[in-house]
Amino acid sequence: MMQKPCQDSYYTLFSSYTMLLDYHEEQAKNSRWIRCKVADLQVEPLGESSPLIGNLSAFAAGTSQEAVKDTAENLGLAMRVNGELYPVRMTAYKSLLDRAKIGGTALPKLSREVLAEVLNECLKLYSADALLLIRDEKISAVHSGDEVDYSVLPIDELLKVLQAKLDARFSGNEFESGYCDHSLVSASWRIVHCSLSSRWPLTTGKTYSDAA
């Protein structure tokens, strides 16, 4: 079965730099960054038995049944932001815990109902800002809203700078392949320079954010 971008396990491959750049330019256009107070975030359980699964109208416009079902099978949490409810992607889990300032190996063992309750009790203690990334129908990151801690660096802009630097230093460089999933972007170029002939993999990473 063909995967859809809303699914947590989605990935795609690229055979040319143009394909890689076009994909991330389109992704950047369709992504939303929302700044809000940590204390205003509200987490809701979205396990496989949750009544929310059968109530698509409860979610923000544009959220598909596939995104809701996939979330129920993975992280099992939704989040209300500025009055709108979104499924939460697995990639957002660590940054969500960071905003709540909690951690530990016991948390994943909790039921989604209890985990949501714990998160809400902790989140409401903090007045700091959060910077949320909404991408492919889900909340994909819950970063710190303090620009000292986190700044957005779009992958498409990074790729343009990288290609320009390669062209300036290594004439005739050739793009070999690219890969992207919801937590990582990687690409490799073949570089032939003077007496040097080798394959140099150049990798760009993103962890939810942009980079994610």
Tell me the role of every PLM-derived stretch.
Residues 1-153:
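Intrinsically disordered, low-complexity regulatory segments
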Residues 152-212:
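Intrinsic disorder/low-complexity polar-acidic segments
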